[in-house]
């Protein structure tokens, strides 16, 4: 055991030395870029500031004073360059540390695969899903208790707006590309050999140096939403389905009789729905953001379906397919000329044809979003237009069941299972959009709608009685009635009307909850319930108690 411990410590020290070397190499590359673009004097100042800062951290008063004097003497242009140099340096350090963690994880996974099953190296990594499952089993959790536990798992991660976030998506994309170059450089056998050229890293650093760090104009709400969606597009859609797969794998190994949970991890967002204190979050903005969410989900799903259709080329001459697959295929065979062409080209590949038809429907849904006005009363109300998430899920389930019933059970895993996980997590809406408004706005709107100028002065009991009576007879308002209302009341009702349209056209999964800021009484919730009835919305109401 002692020898093993010493070996692990030695390995850890070597790994940390590799990280330090990577950081020094990146710092050197940054220095060369600064020298080439700004000149050697700028780099000399960077090094002086760095040296003084390190000394001042050890308590050197003279160094601290010199640091302050040096910074005070900088011109605005040189001060900007120094700020850029240190900002970019720490971004590079962050990239190196992230890559270091990824490298460690990969090494540990590889070591686990090659280790003796009885050795310590074969144990799952700490904080992994399998590690948690094993710990629960060791604590005596039986199958029935485990089934109840996983059935009750419900995790929703919520994105919120941060108006102070100034980093542009352009910079995020550049940093991501640089991170990929560093990863490829660390493993040249598996990647692009051109990335091994040090000049490749320096070109990326130079591009970052010469790119504006901040937006020229203040970001609009839709820009904030696009920045949030960037993380979905670049990382989450690719990574999160693996968590579902990890859960299934861990349960299969350690609790084979326990059924893995479905849809236990989802996302929500406040960006584009939180109008408390932000007049820029209008109903039109909410509709736009819902469209952005929907479009990304449809495009991601469409791409995955196309890839799957190219791989799931099982021939019905080699393997029988279920009647359910035949029925779905019959219903969609004449969806378009393209599907008819696929049918004539691949007449004996039913899964490919069925997925091709689904891809066609996803493409039509994307075109509908691109056309705009999908969440308006003027949009065409074609019953065949909406593409329900459940219809997509049913197609995947039918294909999976057909494969498992025959000799293609292996094909029901892999890409098909991953696309099912993707749908479970993101649906066809990416993230549920929560709506939020201050209770005072609801109170003012209700006062106008009930024609009670004294409404705010009523005591709680009187408000409840009045609202209960109003709720009993409330019906959705028509266009004529809405047109007569004040702008402030329309600002309260219109987002709810958009929510009702989104639930109808995108499905209820597109919306999350309705949050009431500064809730202090039951009447605050009854007011929102009344407003929901007037607009046809049906969001769960979540009171937010604040001080």
Where are each of the predicted segments found?
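Alpha-helix N-cap recognition
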Residues: 388-391, 521, 547
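Core mixed alpha/beta domains of very large multi-subunit molecular machines
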Residues: 442-446, 453-542
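Often metal-dependent polyanion-binding catalytic scaffolds in large enzymes
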Residues: 1-470, 488-491, 539
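Active-site beta-loop-alpha junctions enriched in small/polar residues
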Residues: 272, 435, 516-519, 544-547
